[in-house]
Each structure stands twice: as C-alpha cells, then as structure tokens.
A protein has these predicted regions:
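Charged, low-complexity intrinsically disordered terminal segments
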Residues: 1-200
Length: 200
C-alpha cells in the first residue's frame, strides 16, 4: 500500500444530485484525460446523461477511458457500448473467471472512481444508474464520495491507467504538471490522504 500524501484538497460529496452534478462538471472541465471505473453502469436516464457527457469530451479531443465490471454492468446495452466506441471512448470490460447470466465466479471490479487530468478525482460507493440519483419522487440511496485534488488523485490516475493494455494510447501526464497544480493548493487546505486499492 502507498503511504500518505499531503498536498490534497478534500471534500465529501453526498450521493444523488450533488454527486452527479460534480461528476458531469468534472467530465465537462477535462482537458487531457478522463478515466472512469464503475461496478454498475446502466443506460437509463442517469447513465445516458453521463454517456452524452463522455461523448462530448471525446469529441473535443479528451482521451476517455471507461472500465466496467462485465457482470454487474451487463444491463448496459450493446447499442450504447457501440455508440461510445464510435464517438472515440475506450470501453473495457473487467471479466470474471466464469460467468453466466445469473452466476459468476472470480474477481469483481468494485471500483467507483473518476479521475480527470491526473489531478482531480472522486471515489466512493455510488454507481451510474437511476437508483443512485435523485429523481422526482425517488430520492437516491444515501451514499457518499470523496472528491480530491492533488497528489492522491495522481496515484488513483496511475491505478486506472495501469489497468489498460500498453497498446491503448494514453496521454502522458508528467509529474511536473501535477506538481505545479499541487502548488496551487493553499497549504491551509492541505489534507493527508492515503490511497488503498481493493478490487475484490
């Protein structure tokens, strides 16, 4: 496990509307890359809104990577996957050792994370579908995410990056760029953050 990093700005984000507003804002403000890893991603109203945002990012030249659990996201339609790929979004499935429609055996991708430009990230327990969003007459399940800018986000970025094969071209983010960005965080805002990875 990695040690603690200190140059981080941290904020708790409540699930539902606040989470999805922040998620869309992050994608819309991306300049270089967007990495998303999610356990459940369904192309309902919420999922389709995120899909459109990812497609718009890819259209303006941002490198977009979507990594999903093959079993938990099996309701995502092939049509949506094809449209994402056609728009330039890289889509990858995390496959178990054995699966059928009602059973799986093996490791799962339980990550729920987004990283933008190697400097901003949001990690939590919120999946991409309507039941995690605040819809009219149907409030979201109570869940939280941590939003982070700084060194810890760069570690999460590398975790996401390393899960893609080398043949997939990814923009290289030099540490100096992140170091310069971290320097913009006032020291009074610094929080110590330790990144721990568990994909079971």
């Amino acid at each position: 496990h990695m040690g603690y990093t200190s140059r981080n700005r941290v904020e708790m984000v409540r699930g539902g509307r606040k989470f999805f507003s922040r998620l869309l804002q992050l994608i819309e403000e991306a300049n270089h890359s967007v990495h998303l890893q999610f356990y459940i991603f369904i192309d309902d109203d919420t999922g389709n809104t995120v899909i459109r945002s990812l497609q718009a990012a890819a259209a303006r030249g941002v490198a977009v990577f979507l990594h999903l659990d093959a079993y938990a996201s099996r309701e995502l339609s092939q049509k949506s996957v094809d449209e994402l790929r056609e728009s330039g979004v890289q889509v990858k499935w995390f496959e178990p050792l054995f699966k059928s429609r009602h059973f799986y055996f093996g490791r799962r991708l339980h990550h729920k994370a987004v990283v933008v430009d190697g400097f901003r990230c949001m990690v939590g327990g919120i999946n991409i579908c309507d039941r995690y969003n605040d819809l009219p007459g149907d409030p979201a399940w109570l869940d939280m995410a941590v939003y982070c800018e700084g060194e810890a986000a760069y570690i999460v970025y590398h975790i996401c990056r390393q899960m893609w094969p080398e043949k997939i071209r990814q923009p290289a983010l030099a540490w100096k760029e992140i170091d310069d960005a971290c320097s913009s965080i006032p020291q009074t805002d610094w929080k110590e953050v330790r990144v721990r990875q568990n994909d079971w």
